[in-house]
Design a protein with these regions (language model features):
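Positively charged n-region of N-terminal signal peptides that target proteins for export
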Residues: 1-5
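Metal-dependent phosphoester/phosphodiester hydrolase catalytic core
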Residues: 21-241
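Bacterial N-terminal signal peptides
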Residues: 7-16
Length: 241
């Protein structure tokens, strides 16, 4: 997704949220969740103070958390450092838990997938920035997918964040199209071996869906419902969808 087409996004889920099991990260009641994406790290980010004024219990970043667009992990780390230096982000991080997945521009480059040559280094930079311990099992996964459970027993919410980059098969590009959207006119990939999440992530995802939960929120960095645009979407991998 491109920064020119998407302004910083803030969405709130404000309802009575109840969810899931004994693998709870925090037993404090969660009743309001904020979501964001598409953050240009080089400018002012007043959005963070707007988020805090809404008083969410939890904040979830859904990708393009910085626009690094680089295969160089040093440059990627520098882009994250600019985000980390934002005063509003620092205040928000102290006020509530922050969960995240990535999209293409914080993964490496526009519309990149499994072919990204430095994806493992990008993953470690991502995990470093979001404070994942060096001995965490997440460091060994094939991607940044992650799930957490919040809230007391009987009133728990599970957040599942998918990684639609690390294992994604090549996109199918229709060369003769001139009405380009998000950098290309992509077609469905009907190859039975093509994947969006990869086998390990699918197995993990199935396990997460078995976690007892009254409310389960699944985050994807690319569009789930869209059928018609030429950009990136789950419909590009119909067998996975």
């Amino acid at each position: 997704m491109t920064l020119s087409r998407y302004a910083p996004l803030l969405a709130l889920v404000a309802t009575s949220l109840f969810a899931a099991d004994s693998n709870s990260s925090d037993e404090a009641l969660v009743s309001r969740i904020a979501f964001g994406s598409c953050l240009g790290q080089d400018g002012m980010q007043p959005i963070w103070d707007q988020v805090q004024r809404a008083k969410p219990d939890l904040f979830v970043l859904l990708g393009d958390n910085v626009y690094a667009d680089t295969k160089d992990p040093v440059e990627l780390r520098a882009a994250y450092a600019k985000l980390g230096a934002q005063p509003g982000y620092q205040r928000l991080k102290k006020a509530m838990p922050v969960l995240a997945t990535w999209d293409d521009h914080d993964y490496g480059e526009n519309d990149a997938g499994a072919e990204h040559p430095n994806k493992e280094a990008s993953k470690q930079v991502f995990l470093d920035f979001f404070g994942v311990p060096k001995d965490s099992p997440r460091r060994q996964r094939d991607g940044v997918y992650h799930a957490e459970v919040f809230g007391p027993p009987g009133k728990r919410v599970q957040i599942i964040l998918l990684d639609t980059r690390f294992n994604r098969s090549p996109l199918v590009f229709q060369e003769d199209k001139t009405d380009l959207v998000d950098g290309g006119r992509y077609l469905p990939n009907d190859d039975p071996n093509a994947t969006l999440l990869g086998a390990s992530q699918w197995a993990w995802f199935e396990e997460q869906l078995r976690v007892p939960a009254q409310v389960r929120i699944i985050g994807s960095s690319i569009e789930v419902v869209d059928e018609d645009s030429g950009g990136e979407k789950w419909a590009n991998f119909p067998l996975e969808r």
